[in-house]
Structure formats: C-alpha cells, structure tokens
Amino acid sequence: MTRKTDDIFAAPLQEMIDFKFDERVVAVFPDMIQRSVPGYGMIISNIGILAAKYAQAGSHCYDLGCSLGAATLSMRQRISQPNCDIIAVDNSPAMIERGRELLARDSQPTVPVALICANIQDVVIENASVVVLNFTLQFIPPEQRLALIKRIHAGLRPGGILILSEKIAFSEPARQHFHVEMHHDFKRANGYSDMEISQKRSALENVMIPETVACHQERLLQAGFSSSELWFQCFNFASMVAFK
C-alpha cells in the first residue's frame, strides 16, 4: 500500500493549536514518524528482539501508547514463549481503529493482541514481563511520570523489563543546540521545509516535554528498577531498557 505523505504543516496556519493524534495525523503517521524520528525503524526492530529475550511464559507484554501498533507487531513476530499475550493501549480512537486494521493483516498472528482505547494511567498493569513506552512518556505531564513508572515497576514480574524510548533534552546549552540543529537537518533531508519544522515545533511545544537521560535514569531508580541501560541514541532521540 502507498504510504500517505505528511503535509499537515505544509501550509501556513492562521492559528497554532496544540498537536493531537487525530484522524489527520493517523492518516500520515507512518510517513511522519519515519521522516521525523532518526533510527525509528531500528528501535522498532530491536523492541521485538528485546521482547523475544525477556518475555516470560504465561505473562502479559504491554505496549503503552501503541499508536498504530508498530512495536506491538514487532513483539508479536518475535515472541516465542508459550501463553504470552500483548495488551496494546492508546487514548486516540482513530489510532486504535487504524491499528486494528493493520494488525488484522498480520499473516502470522501467533501471539494474541488486545487493543484497548484508554489513557495509559488508567490501565491495570499486572503479571507483566515486558512493558514498552515508545515515545509515550514525553506526552505525559512531568508531575505524573514517576507515578506511572512506579505502577509499571509494581506490575512487572522479577526479571521483567521496561523499554523506554524518548526524545531527549541536554542540560548543556551547546549540546542541546547541536542535537536540535542536527534533528532539524535530518528532517530537512527527509523533505520537510523550514516552515513545516517551525510550525510542528510550535504545535508540540506545550504537549511534548523532553527530559535528559539522567532525569529518566534517576526516575527509573526512584521507581524501584535495579538498573537501566541506554541502548540506542541518534541525535536527540534515545531508547533505554530498565530491569526489575
């Protein structure tokens, strides 16, 4: 199927409104994420590899903020442990509806998937071996993040993992400037205009709040995780795995 091109911010907007995952975004999301997030495909692929290693028999794997289910599909295609299932959650009805269509096309549905439209803060996490927050925590208000991570830790089995991917910030101004500029250059190289980059940045300003890797790592320790590893970084995008 032909991938629809993201042109949401291609024309000047008369009034800037906060970014939201509505039907317009859902229609172009695969194109948007590939052209906007350096290394996205590698992150998705390796989420499946991590899940294959750490999924435990008879447990749940959670994809919190699943969008169209890319991480869910990656896990589904890799997990071989018996009696595992995946619980995929997103609060966008349009995302869940489209995600259900895409999952239905999977030719080897060996692992059951439950798609749930809900706020991830309201979902009960229990008997989990793998939990994924793939570019999701950054959209949760900062003051609510620790409580969510604590709930995830409490719902994980011993030996379970949390995979946390985020756009990140840097405390040193020079490093922050470098990574922001390189990200903008990455987007330009993928066909976005300066106006598109500027308008999307403004739309996300009050919605997505990045933090430093150190901030994430400290929160993971506060929540009870024994350790964490930064396993991927490209410019100001990173993914970590935390161990219970």
Swiss-Prot record:
Gene3D superfamilies: Vaccinia Virus protein VP39. S-adenosyl-L-methionine binds at residues 40, 65-67, 90-91, 134, 201. GO terms for molecular function: carboxyl- or carbamoyltransferase activity; S-adenosyl-L-methionine binding. It comes from the Bacteria. Signal peptide: none annotated. InterPro entries: CmoA, Methyltransf_25, SAM-dependent_MTases_sf. Homodimer. Catalyzes the conversion of S-adenosyl-L-methionine (SAM) to carboxy-S-adenosyl-L-methionine (Cx-SAM). This is Carboxy-S-adenosyl-L-methionine synthase. The gene is cmoA.
